[in-house]
C-alpha cells in the first residue's frame, strides 16, 4: 500500500508539469530492428542487457505490472522504459538499487542513444532478471545469450542491479555471451571493503575482461554539515 501511495503521489506531482513550457525536452524515436540493420550496416551492432532485481521480499521489479521473477529475457525498446514500463519495488539503498526514476532515465540507455548512428548501431535492449535459484539464473542467462546470437551482434553491454547474488547473473551472462562470439562489457556494482582491498564481486570469470566499475559501495564518504536539513536527523546514527 505504501508503494502504491508513492506511485500515485508521483503521478500527481508529475501532472503539475503537464502544459508547462519552462523546461527542456528531447524527443526519442525507435525504429524496428530490421530498419536499424538497414540504416547503419557498417556500424557495430550493440545491445544492452539490462539485469533487474527480482529476489523477492522488497527486492522486486515490475515489468508492465508483471513481477520480473516470472519473466523470461525479453526485448524491450528503450523508449518503453523511458515511458515507465519498468517500476521498482525495491527497498532502495543508495547507489545499489534502481528507483523507478533511474529506470526511466537510465544513463546507459541515454549514452547509447547519443552514440547511435555515430559510432554504434544501438539495436535494442534485452531485459532479464536476477532470481535467487541457480536453475533460474542458468535459464535466463542461457536465453539471453541465445538471443544475442540470433540478433547477430558485435557487442553487448551488461549491467547489474544489486550486489552479491546478482554478481552471478552478471558473470553468467558475460561468459555465455562471450562464448557466442560477442564482445561483452560489464558494468559492476562492487563492494571491496572500506580500504578497497577485498574481492569486490562474489563471482568472476576470465571472460569478464572488459569492466566498467560503478565504484566501491563500501567506501565511507564524510559529508559536510548542512546549514538546513529538511526532515529528521533522528535516524542518521542508527
Where are each of the predicted segments found?
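An N-terminal assembly and electron-transfer interface module characteristic of large anaerobic redox
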Residues: 1-238
Amino acid at each position: 500500500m505504501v508503494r502504491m501511495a508513492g506511485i500515485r503521489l508521483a503521478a500527481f506531482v508529475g501532472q503539475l508539469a503537464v502544459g508547462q513550457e519552462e523546461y527542456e525536452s528531447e524527443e526519442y524515436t525507435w525504429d524496428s530492428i530490421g530498419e536499424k540493420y538497414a540504416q547503419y550496416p557498417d556500424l557495430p551492432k550493440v545491445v544492452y542487457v539490462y539485469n533487474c532485481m527480482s529476489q523477492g521480499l522488497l527486492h522486486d521489479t515490475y515489468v508492465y505490472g508483471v513481477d520480473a521473477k516470472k519473466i523470461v529475457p525479453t526485448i524491450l525498446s528503450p523508449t518503453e522504459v523511458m515511458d515507465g514500463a519498468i517500476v521498482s519495488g525495491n527497498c532502495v539503498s543508495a547507489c545499489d538499487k534502481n528507483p523507478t526514476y533511474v529506470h526511466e532515465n537510465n544513463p546507459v540507455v541515454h549514452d547509447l542513444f547519443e552514440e547511435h548512428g555515430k559510432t554504434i548501431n544501438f539495436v535494442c535492449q534485452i531485459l532479464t532478471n536476477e532470481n535467487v535459484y541457480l536453475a533460474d539464473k542458468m535459464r535466463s542467462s542461457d536465453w539471453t545469450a541465445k538471443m544475442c546470437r540470433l540478433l547477430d551482434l558485435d557487442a553487448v553491454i551488461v549491467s547489474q542491479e544489486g550486489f552479491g547474488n546478482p554478481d552471478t547473473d552478471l558473470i553468467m551472462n558475460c561468459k555465455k555471451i562471450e562464448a557466442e562470439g560477442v564482445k561483452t562489457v560489464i558494468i559492476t556494482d562492487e563492494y571491496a571493503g572500506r580500504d578497497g582491498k577485498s574481492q569486490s564481486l562474489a563471482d568472476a570469470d576470465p571472460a569478464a575482461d572488459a569492466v566498467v566499475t560503478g565504484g566501491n559501495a563500501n567506501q565511507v564518504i564524510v559529508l559536510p554539515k548542512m546549514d538546513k536539513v529538511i526532515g529528521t536527523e533522528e535516524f542518521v546514527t542508527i
